[in-house]
Regions:
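Active-site neighborhoods and metal-handling regions in enzymes and metal-associated proteins
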Residues: 1-212
Length: 212
C-alpha cells in the first residue's frame, strides 16, 4: 500500500462495510501497521502502511440485534512474511489452535488461557529468549513469557464486546463452559521496537490472531 495514512484508509474502509452490512462497528477498529501492532489498543490509526510491515486488524461488526463479532488478523502488507515474522506468526497460530482445542463444555474458562500460554512459552523458549525454561516461566510467580504476551487469551463475547468482564473470578475465570457460551480465543506476541532481548529482525513485530 505504502500510503502515508494507510491505517486510516483501512479503518475507513472497514467502517463503510460495517455500516452497509450490519448496524455499526462493534468497537473502535484497531488498524495497526508495523510497530503500532505492539500497542494493544492502537485506535489512532493515523500511521502509514508500508511494504514489509505487518498489519494487525482487530475489528468487528455489530449486527441489527446489537450482538457483535470480534476478529483479529495479522497479515503482511506486501503479501509475504519475513522469516522472523513467520516464526512469530506460527507460534501464535499454534497457541490459538491449542486454545480452541481446549474449548468444550465442562472445561474451566481459564483452561483456554493456560493452553495458549503453554504454547507461547515453549515457542519463546525455542527462540532462545527466555532466561528460564518454559515450564519455569509458566509458574505464576515467574511469568517471564508475559513480557511478550501481555493480555489474556480471550474473553466472553455478546452484546458487550468484553461480555461479563466485571464478573467475579470464581464465576468467570473458574467458571465452567457450557453449551451456548460464546467467547474469543486470541493469543498474541508483541516485541517492542526497543526490546534488546530479541535480535533486531524481530523487533517491532506484533501479532495477534483472534476468532470467535
Amino acid at each position: 500500500m505504502n500510503h502515508p495514512r494507510g491505517e486510516r484508509v483501512i479503518d475507513g474502509t472497514f467502517y463503510k462495510r460495517a455500516r452497509v452490512e450490519g448496524n455499526e462497528l462493534g468497537y473502535n477498529t484497531i488498524a495497526a501497521a508495523g510497530a503500532h501492532a505492539c500497542v494493544l489498543h492502537w485506535i489512532r490509526n493515523d500511521g502509514p502502511a508500508l511494504s514489509g510491515d505487518l498489519l494487525l486488524l482487530d475489528a468487528g461488526v455489530e449486527v441489527e440485534s446489537h450482538y457483535t463479532a470480534d476478529i483479529t488478523r495479522t497479515i503482511p502488507i506486501n503479501g509475504k512474511f519475513t522469516k522472523a515474522q513467520r516464526e512469530i506468526y506460527e507460534i501464535v497460530l499454534a497457541a490459538q489452535q491449542a486454545g480452541i482445542d481446549a474449548v468444550k463444555p465442562g472445561a474451566k474458562y481459564r483452561d483456554i488461557n493456560n493452553a495458549c500460554m503453554k504454547v507461547l512459552a515453549k515457542g519463546l523458549e525455542k527462540l532462545g529468549v527466555l532466561t528460564v525454561s518454559a515450564e519455569q516461566s509458566l509458574n505464576p510467580e515467574v511469568g517471564i513469557h508475559r513480557r511478550w504476551s501481555v493480555h489474556a487469551s480471550g474473553h466472553m463475547l455478546g452484546i458487550d464486546v468484553h461480555d461479563c468482564a466485571k464478573a467475579r473470578g470464581e464465576q468467570y475465570l473458574d467458571g465452567e463452559l457450557a453449551v451456548g457460551h460464546v467467547l474469543t480465543v486470541e493469543p498474541g506476541l508483541y516485541i517492542q521496537p526497543d526490546d534488546l532481548l530479541f535480535p533486531e529482525e524481530y523487533r517491532g513485530i506484533g501479532i495477534r490472531i483472534e476468532d470467535d
